[in-house]
């Protein structure tokens, strides 16, 4: 019998306690109350002027050391309860989606927050004594009310009042199984909740009650109290509040309570939710099972005294800073930095190394334009409102570049302004950004992709066909399009076998290839005599298949049974040709590169995908936020992504931008839709200005990232640069180090613990230590 791994044993020891967590949350979700009156929350309502009613909620808290199994325990909730699984950040939601194999939104998406709300800033509310849960809720609601007002107004326009008033319980339960939202379940799970400001908790509770009241759902009618499951670590990265100063044109950023420290540290809140009975603490690190590494994480998690032995242990990871900053060292490792500027600087140095011709594991540098358009009329109105008459469009762009797109990693990119054009209507600026082929990227939002080809080996493509894995993962809604796509790929790929024989000048192989039997359903217009005559008339350089078989029908011109018949026949031909090729050229043929596209494709300079065809077509679907895609290049071919985006940006700017081409883990090639969004500037008086539209590609490099972005991820190889920052926090060290899955694959430029010897214990750590000694707290080892 094989020896059981430490990871398996640790997970099995957690099993019984995880079952208890599920049952406790199930009981909390069954609590009902008299539903609060929500009609008072209208356009005229303002919580600062008139406090609202108590919005009841329950809460279950899951905390613990990084990698201890907090996030993976969410899968038990997903399997056993009807619950809405969300992440606090895009990275957290992507990791959840990967674990659960389903789409998990961010909590912001779940309660209706959109990109246009980014620049609506929370209020600054004066501090005051808060003795009751009602006062605390109203205080938190006041902060976020400008955003919540916009969200509920939009929801009220899209959804009919009383939409589910007459729905039966059976029909509603069916709806809940089909789609999980704030109005189909009262269990809301938030992973990495420690990164969220405290007012987000009240925002989620408010939106739950408002949405269910507006729709008059069975949940509202029965008074089902929302159960918010907060997962994370209060001692990891801090939460921040930001306010934008329009006069100075800069953000003022301040630390604030995160949801977990708010729940744990606020006596009124912790007593309201009965925290001592609704708190699970995960103890052992399962991401990396090295005992010394686990002890290091516990020391940081609980702010324990740092022993000389711990100091010596972390000294092992220290290497010269120059090695980490050198892109030719630690190839394939993810660099972690404290600031966006450092990420950008590292990427620039990597790109410089590629420009000078230094070989970095076969990587190749290419550039793509990013475009911005500032609208003159709106910009002049904005300047007048904020009393900045001398501010120019280019000055505003330089100061607000980091705010132009809808994700924080936009500013990390190595980009340079190369062209500015000013007209009466707008100022157009084009930037050039650098990317590296064959490096991995992640997507930052819901992006359409057009799957248009495959690049891999014959062996791997054969496995895909035989397992039908592509069909299983793509043919849920409209299988006819999936079969049509595969038919086209197979049909176009069969020439590869003939072309190889011509290249090798193997006439015997070509004769055998020409005499392979073709399925009758593809050649029904010909008699056997016709086929024999056609074969005899052709030269060896001609592939008989394409003379006998016309291209497969499209999804819109044939029925599903017809397309399946075509797919089965073409797959049989592919397998028979592959078998013949391996007979003639041995099994080494299976490892040869296999390429096929929906059109005749040429790749210029190994980067630009082009064709004599006027348009690139393929299988249209949404790109996975779960998967890491490998950059392959770009194409200027027109790609049909269905309904076009409505965001305003000049056509000449859009035409400058190509579509990024990526490869998924299976080998399929796809084009990504461009990320075009508009920037709304919202002033304190509620006045909004559509100042700018920006177009980029919505992708982030996995070569380097900030420590904050890395929270919630597991990284195989990590190189951390703490640099010379004067205010390194325990939370920074904790998050960065705990990303590692193997202590043999982690390096850093210094021992940051030496700067923290006199660091005071955090309030959250004090509460956690008390909880460890509380018999009512559930400890999961």
UniProtKB/Swiss-Prot annotation:
GO cellular component, one term: host cell nucleus
Keyword line: ATP-binding, DNA replication, Helicase, Host nucleus, Hydrolase, Nucleotide-binding
Keyword Cell membrane: no
Location in the cell: Host nucleus
Gene Ontology molecular function terms on file: ATP binding; helicase activity; hydrolase activity
Principal cellular location given in the protein's record: host cell
Binding-site list for ATP: 64-71
Pfam families: Herpes_Helicase (PF02689)
Domain of life: Viruses
Record bears the keyword Magnesium: no
A single BP term in Gene Ontology: DNA replication
Function: This protein may be a helicase and is required for replication of viral DNA.
Quaternary organization: Associates with the primase and the primase-associated factor to form the helicase-primase complex.
Family of this protein: Belongs to the herpesviridae helicase family.
Name of the featured protein: DNA replication helicase
Taxonomic lineage: Viruses, Duplodnaviria, Heunggongvirae, Peploviricota, Herviviricetes
